[in-house]
């Protein structure tokens, strides 16, 4: 009973709020003249903000217009990469993708009123509208497989991100609302937006003045910050429709495939798409699977000031196990992974 109360209980204070005074039917429709539940619920809209043009736009026209093309609304990144893998078979694969892979598409309400179904669903606070989404109850619903557990230190044996544990920062400390609400630009993946977030926004002044840390002087911006400052993070493997995937902690350095980011080496995370991910629904659904790596650049949210890699040069130099090498690739992996492997491990440095 307690769970159901949390899911559906509407706080009396909500009824006198700006949204509450509009009345339930103004967003949820149904039949407000009926006294019987079955009649009252005819035509009921469970998530009105899924139709933001109708419900949210009259009062929030600019945000509603921008949100339609936002990555949170379109989850376009999945489609962008799957199109490349599917090639000529995309038209056949698209309806399967729409049915199976866009569950983390988010509506306005999934941040401001309720939890996303993938996070258990239910109202956040008695139907009160949260102007600033409570990140512990919303962001983690969709980003709970990797980002959220990393940030809060929920992977066994791995510490929380120092920005959370020491400074009590949250998602909004780095990520601007434009990343969530959109900018009216129909981005094909999330990278143009998250590329605007940089460690140098806060740490750049010291770095540019000339750090006393030798690694900063030697490597400059050739290395993504996380290469030296990340803890272990999870990679996912073998995702199949209807069966899910498995995951494991990992740490691999590889070559960056994004010139706009400005560094040569980045951390890589294994993503779960395999050649036969859609085999139960469509045979040979990904004929161009080899064109896209399944070791992808990543920015783990588990930053540590001190790690075993930044204690000495030889935390990385000569330490082959932390670099993605050819022998790390599985037999069925895409050939495009050869673009991100590190062919030559930096040699161990001798003490002077």
Regions found by a protein language model. Give the residues of each.
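C-type cytochrome heme-c attachment and multiheme electron-transfer modules
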Residues: 1-119, 128-352
